[in-house]
Amino acid sequence: MDNVRTALITGASSGIGASLAVAVAASGVTLHLSGRNSTRLEAVAQTCRGRGGIVTTTTLDVRDADAMAAWIGSAGHLDLVIANAGISGRSRDGGAECWNLARAIFETNLGGVLNTVLPAMAVMAEQLPGAGGVRGRIAVISSIAAFMAAPDSAAYCASKAAVDRWIVASAHEARQRGIVLTSVCPGFIRTAMTADYRFPMPGLMDADRAAHVILRGVTAGRGRVVFPWWMGLAARLAGLLPSRVMAAVASRHR
């Protein structure tokens, strides 16, 4: 990304976040990376430094609003912010999700995004506009799951739907302030999160390739990046199915 000199990425210690950090890293680019695993985060930072990047790392939980606001506020000028941190979870044996699991998913996937995007927008709104009047770009990692309602992943689907709709709905007003918002809805990505899945994952993609697709869409200023496109279409069609049909399909892959 030629116009990015400073970037901030959450959930950068593994998976898509790590691949995005490495993809953005280049000579003269400053990266502010956060994650919960300090050892893995430092390993990613070292890789980015090897590509010429200037890297700072912070170990924190995106659910901590005060810590997030302080971290983002201390970063200085921000060209690109990627709210990537997220978790998943599935109910066991077709039962309802426990309260603790559902709450953790919403607090991380939705609350964590709010704790990232809102402070970042405040910082960017004070920056001088660049090419095309853009003050900064913010991408949020949602999921193709946002378009459907998987019975055994209710909180995950709902949390990803919430952030997708929020970003898409906020994009016009944000653009008037010089801030470009992008909702990213990937399909299955080969990460630690999907390693334990025991069901078919059509279109499974490497995290490095996914990072390339994401950054290409963000650079183009797209409001929503959905890939693979055919998975996005399939998810939207699945979202039209009666709940009993979705439940029957899910039960076959437990």
Locate predicted features.
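Conserved glycine-rich cofactor-binding loop
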Residues: 13-14
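Conserved glycine-rich Rossmann-like NAD(P)H-binding loop of the short-chain dehydrogenase/reductase
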Residues: 29-44
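Conserved mid-core segment of classical short-chain dehydrogenase/reductases
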Residues: 88-103, 126-131, 152
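Active-site helix of classical SDR
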Residues: 117, 159
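Residue(s) in the substrate-gating loop at a strand-loop-helix junction
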Residues: 143
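Active-site-adjacent segment of SDR/Rossmann-fold oxidoreductases
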Residues: 148, 169-180
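C-terminal helical subdomain
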Residues: 183, 199-233
